[in-house]
């Protein structure tokens, strides 16, 4: 075989890395919707996760997170890598997530849905937040605690009481909307947060904001927004829904 010369070039687009749960059927599609291909390069790894999301399966994810980070392309230099689990971050700890990812992949910044949600709420200058979660109380409650530790007030929280991730991915958008209306009716709120990256939320955000006259945030929406902000991407080039999509982060 004759050797032929070639040239090497680097793609100038920002690289984003996403570590999704093995059972998550929603986040990857949502991210490809929010980040059109010309805007950034998106690389996705998966972390093993049980069919049920419980404190025990989340603890196991902490052990598997380093290997999931190492499965991202090792030659790539990422602007941001995110761990895509809201409840996982609340139980493992955002600081620990950052530590594990930085130790196992090359990236300027690390994000997660809990940190992203707090940054988004601060950017929107809201303090009283209602939460809708698909999970049982032992998985959902630490998210509330994470918000409260960031000096946010959570007047009310609703959950679907679900443990099986395959069912979470199939919760009807109409049910999500009904829960958002219910939590808004039960307390004075500045915003609503729809928790869980496996919940199908992007499509309902514009309608809910119009009906409730409140900012409506969700795990995938805030994570995409936060990653874009950390990577220096212009929000006008993305498709982040709702009021948040027009708001720059205060980093």
Residue ranges and their predicted role:
Residues 1-70, 132-172:
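N-terminal glycine-rich anion-binding loop in soluble enzyme alpha/beta folds
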Residues 62-76, 175-189:
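Short, well-structured alpha-helical segments in soluble
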Residues 68-115:
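Glycine/small-residue-rich loop that forms an oxyanion/phosphate-binding "nest" at active or ligand-binding sites
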Residues 78-84, 130-131, 189-196:
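Periplasmic-binding protein-like
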Residues 178-211, 223-224:
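Hydrophobic alpha-helical
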Residues 218-251:
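C-terminal functional extensions of proteins
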């Amino acid at each position: 075989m004759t050797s032929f010369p070639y040239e090497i070039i680097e793609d100038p687009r920002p690289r984003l890395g996403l570590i999704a749960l093995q059972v998550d059927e929603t986040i990857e599609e949502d991210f490809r919707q929010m980040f059109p291909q010309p805007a950034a390069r998106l690389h996705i790894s998966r972390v093993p996760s049980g069919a049920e999301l419980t404190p025990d399966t989340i603890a196991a994810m902490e052990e598997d997170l380093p290997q999931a980070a190492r499965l991202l392309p090792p030659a790539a230099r990422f602007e941001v890598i995110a761990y895509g689990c809201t409840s996982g971050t609340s139980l493992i700890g955002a600081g620990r997530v950052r530590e594990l990812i930085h130790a196992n992949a090359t990236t300027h910044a690390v994000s997660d849905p809990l940190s992203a949600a707090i940054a988004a709420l601060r950017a929107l200058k809201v303090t009283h937040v209602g939460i809708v979660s698909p999970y049982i109380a032992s998985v959902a409650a630490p998210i509330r605690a994470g918000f409260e530790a960031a000096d946010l007030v959570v007047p009310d929280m609703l959950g679907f009481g679900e443990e099986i991730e395959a069912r979470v991915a199939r919760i009807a958008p109409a049910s999500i909307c009904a829960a958002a209306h219910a939590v808004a009716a039960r307390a004075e709120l500045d915003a609503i947060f729809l928790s869980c990256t496996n919940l199908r939320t992007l499509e309902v955000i514009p309608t809910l904001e119009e009906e409730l006259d409140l900012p409506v945030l969700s795990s995938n929406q805030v994570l995409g927004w936060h990653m874009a902000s950390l990577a220096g991407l212009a929000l006008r080039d993305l498709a982040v829904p709702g009021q948040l999509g027009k708001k720059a982060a205060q980093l």
